[in-house]
Amino acid sequence: MSLRIGVIGTGAIGKEHINRITNKLSGAEIVAVTDVNQEAAQKVVEQYQLNATVYPNDDSLLADENVDAVLVTSWGPAHESSVLKAIKAQKYVFCEKPLATTAEGCMRIVEEEIKVGKRLVQVGFMRRYDSGYVQLKEALDNHVIGEPLMIHCAHRNPTVGDNYTTDMAVVDTLVHEIDVLHWLVNDDYESVQVIYPKKSKNALPHLKDPQIVVIETKGGIVINAEIYVNCKYGYDIQCEIVGEDGIIKLPEPSSISLRKEGRFSTDILMDWQRRFVAAYDVEIQDFIDSIQKKGEVSGPTAWDGYIAAVTTDACVKAQESGQKEKVELKEKPEFYQSFTTVQN
């Protein structure tokens, strides 16, 4: 029997997930949708020829007994409310980041899920499903390079929109590194510091770009993360981990190499969608399969969403203060201690 999914938010990412569930993945079907723009929601149903009900809001969608699980792909500030309602309705819920716009909001979700006593919430940190990051994780878990000491990483975009602000460099951009790095090294963060190099001529007047974020873990690992969102040349994600006995590096996306007219070259991707499209597919398929086979989700947890929120809050504070700031996490609840989110 197919998992019956409702989608809350039919914008760009919502449509992408509807398309992959309908046309690429197995074991699920879209049976309900809702969006603040009802006309847009209806158009999505028609575009993908869905046998789905268009609901006026998330309350009515979640009240549908034919909905087993929901995808929350709406505007970020609306996520917390929809996720809390889904938990109370005993629905499985996949929520794109952010889980909530504040650490307090994430903690409310954590507490509600603990009350239920069952893992219902998965957060959309798709890099854990990228084959390159999975290879890094396997190498670290197998101690191929000994204990990790330092991590050098970069998150570069060709350009960003006029509404992109300095704090978004960590809240919207670096948040992916924040999640995947603590997963890779299995260590919590201790402190963060933000350094502003010389400003790029490509950055808009209101935006400080590039930025370097220095993160220290409780175990002493030092991470330097470059964020450069106006690099012009492409969408470029880098990660190099220096261990006691060697170095491992995130592989480049697969691409043909060209030898022509005295040059040797390979293409660089220009957007995040192409870079991580396979990871999105694996991520949503895992959400479906875990529910069908285990009756619980197995991807990034609500607690992971809380860690990301606390860490980005500390980064924003460091942007403003220019000082090293503490990452002050609450004690991890026992409920989440037994869950692993390592992908195979």
Curated annotation (Swiss-Prot):
Is Acetylation found in the keyword set?
no
User: Which Pfam family, any one, appears in the UniProt record?
Assistant: GFO_IDH_MocA
The processes (GO biological process) annotated in the record are:
inositol catabolic process
Q: Which InterPro entries match?
A: Gfo-Idh-MocA_inositol_DH, Gfo/Idh/MocA-like_OxRdtase_C, Gfo/Idh/MocA-like_OxRdtase_N, MI/DCI_dehydrogenase, NAD(P)-bd_dom_sf
What is known about its induction? By inositol. Subjected to catabolite repression.
Q: How does activity depend on pH?
A: Optimum pH is 9.5 for inositol 2-dehydrogenase activity.
Give me the reactions it catalyses: myo-inositol + NAD(+) = scyllo-inosose + NADH + H(+); 1D-chiro-inositol + NAD(+) = scyllo-inosine + NADH + H(+)
Pathway participation:
Polyol metabolism; myo-inositol degradation into acetyl-CoA; acetyl-CoA from myo-inositol: step 1/7
GO molecular function: any one? Answer: inositol 2-dehydrogenase (NAD+) activity
Q: What is its EC number?
A: 1.1.1.18, 1.1.1.369
The record's keywords, sorted A to Z, are: NAD, Oxidoreductase
Assembly notes: Homotetramer.
What this chain does, per the record? Involved in the oxidation of myo-inositol (MI) and D-chiro-inositol (DCI) to 2-keto-myo-inositol (2KMI or 2-inosose) and 1-keto-D-chiro-inositol (1KDCI), respectively. Can also use D-glucose and D-xylose, and shows a trace of activity with D-ribose and D-fructose.
Family per similarity comment: Belongs to the Gfo/Idh/MocA family.
Q: What name does the UniProt record give this protein?
A: Inositol 2-dehydrogenase/D-chiro-inositol 3-dehydrogenase
Could you tell me which species this protein originates from?
A: Bacillus subtilis (strain 168)
Task: Identify the gene encoding this protein.
Answer: iolG
